[in-house]
A protein has these predicted regions:
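Catalytic core segments in nucleotide and nucleic-acid processing enzymes
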Residues: 2-135
Length: 135
């Protein structure tokens, strides 16, 4: 039975929920920096995702720099961590920098991964869940 009062209480405490533990005891955590952390079943961070949703091309380089800073910190803590950038605006300049940037393991266009019928969506899901194996 659903209790609407309980639901309101849970929604009121939404800031307390930082993530989810999957059935295989891996976790997906949400925070300010990095935006998303992927933890294996030992609690080790194996992936970091930065989401940059700004659509203004003039700010694309700044958003890339902010993501890079977060990735550098994650790599400083664990040199084996995979870093994934998800951005809605990747200019040609940012694209060129990403392609030569060793701190970024993979990157995806936010608009394209929001469509379940896109190849980018499939690649993104595969990338994330390859870090959180079901074993």
């Amino acid at each position: 039975m659903n209790n609407p009062d309980r639901l309101e209480e849970q929604i009121g405490n939404i800031e307390c929920y930082r993530g989810v533990m999957l059935a295989n005891h891996t976790s997906i955590l949400f925070s300010n920096e990095p935006d998303i952390s992927l933890l294996n079943n030992q609690g080790t961070t194996v992936g970091i995702i930065e989401v940059k949703g700004g659509a203004d091309p003039a700010g694309a380089l700044e958003r890339y720099g902010a993501a890079k800073k977060s990735f550098e910190e994650g790599l400083r803590r664990n040199s084996d961590v995979r870093t994934i950038l998800v951005a809605s605006c990747i200019t040609s300049e940012v694209d060129n920098r990403i392609k030569t940037d060793s701190t970024i393991s993979a990157y995806f266009n936010l608009t394209e991964i929001l469509s379940e019928n896109s190849r980018q969506y499939d690649q993104f899901v595969q990338e994330v869940f390859s870090l959180l194996p079901a074993e």
